Amino acid sequence: MRKIKFFDTTLRDGEQSAGVNLNLQEKLEIARQLERLRVDIIEAGFPASSKGDFEAVKQIAETVRTCSVTGLSRSVRSDIDAAWEALKGGAEPRLHLFIATSPIHMVHKLRMTPEQVIEAAVEAVKYAKRFFPIVQWSAEDACRSELPFLAKIVAEVIKAGASVINIPDTVGYITPKEYGEIFLYLQNNVPNIENVSLSAHCHDDLGMAVVNSLSAIEHGATQVECTINGIGERAGNAALEEIAVALHIRKDYYQVETRLNLQEIKRTSNLVSKLTGVVVPPNKAVVGKNAFAHESGIHQDGVLKEKTTYEIISPELVGVPSNSMVLGKHSGRHALRNRVEELGYTLSDEEINQLFVRFKELADKKKDITDDDLIALIFEEKFDHFKDFYQLSSIQVQYGTNQIPTAVVVLKDGKGNEIQEAATGAGSVEALYNTLERCFQTPVTLLDYRIESVGGGRDALAQVFVKVRAHDIETSGRGTAQDVLEASAKAYINAINRVFMIEAMRGENEKVATP
């Protein structure tokens, strides 16, 4: 049975989603979870694009041991050199090279002739092979390329040493039948193509990324590139969880196998959603909250009698928990640490100690602490602190039906200086955000505001997600507290801290368009 490798690009292509800006700690946590999911390859970033990306790729390569870590590179030596410096400490360093091959890209973007493109691709592969044991080569915008030229350049890069050939549908243009035919054409027209692995990379602009990826697998691809929850630029990428479960449930049809641990899918989906702020639609296949819900009376009756009447995927297959452990104010540090590890999170002794303090504070106000509560506390403790930027000291909001909402906020900056401001607004949240904007002394545009309850009950934690734009940077933030307004303030501060973090970490190089 053929083995299909999963190449996860959540940390590279997925992070190109509008408003998604992950910090180093968040990227490392996602990489560790992808390792638990047992993906074959993690594309950790684009090392030459910025200092922040370089450092993230380097640390992920040095941390992950049971799967290969790769980075993206243009077909230029400086990019390849940067990628090698970032990836050389990995368990299996590999490089992902790309260059555009469609007429529209060669003429208008590269301004190169087809012969020049072939020469650049071959030279880049040969140079990369001096360092990397595995070189993957991608034909950007392959699906709008002329097939004879595509076959010619693929043949040349194979001769130069590429061992993986990726055929990206960069703009989500292709149909399943056409995509499969490209793979067949290459297999029939490229010498020695049987000695390399063929890879699929699909975008979802026409809603066909997953089915196109499956078509590629049917027609000879042995690697598929995808992201968790299908996040990515524009309409997103092919969703890893949908492809993986389709291959498992319909193994009779596809006749392939993977090394994925499917029981880690739901946990991975939740982690990526929380850290990126990208909501998983309720009706999303495999990981949506309604994926296993049955509303129809006839369906409910059938499922109660025999699950397989209306349920082709069991919740347990993808790690949807049937119950959760409840902790309380009498639970000790050891029980807390054990549960944190069972939930799949890695915390240092210092982080556990700080989490235990927050846990006890919440346990004094809330009788039962569920897994959802604990995860919210972990996120706040592990990912939402920016010690070098603003931290909330206190808020006070006055509101009444016949009063103008007024907020008073006290913040501390990275140097420990105290900042106090007050402002009014049409509502409590606006008053709060107007006050915070005065503290930051910078104009901020609120693009989105969303509030969720963590679990049920009147004593549930509130979790607020915001998306903002400041200094021409669009980013998201999150905050958790029992009080809605405190959670709202934390989310806004978290988002602004990310803006300042991005500005501080920006290198001289700007982000580059990629496949």
From Swiss-Prot:
Cofactor: Mn(2+)
Region span, Regulatory domain: 391-515
Sites where the protein binds Mn(2+): 13, 201, 203, 237
Keyword Cell membrane: no
Enzyme class: transferase
EC number of this enzyme: 2.3.3.13
Compartment list: Cytoplasm
Quaternary structure and partners: Homodimer.
Function text: Catalyzes the condensation of the acetyl group of acetyl-CoA with 3-methyl-2-oxobutanoate (2-ketoisovalerate) to form 3-carboxy-3-hydroxy-4-methylpentanoate (2-isopropylmalate).
HAMAP family: LeuA_type1 (MF_01025)
UniProt protein name: 2-isopropylmalate synthase
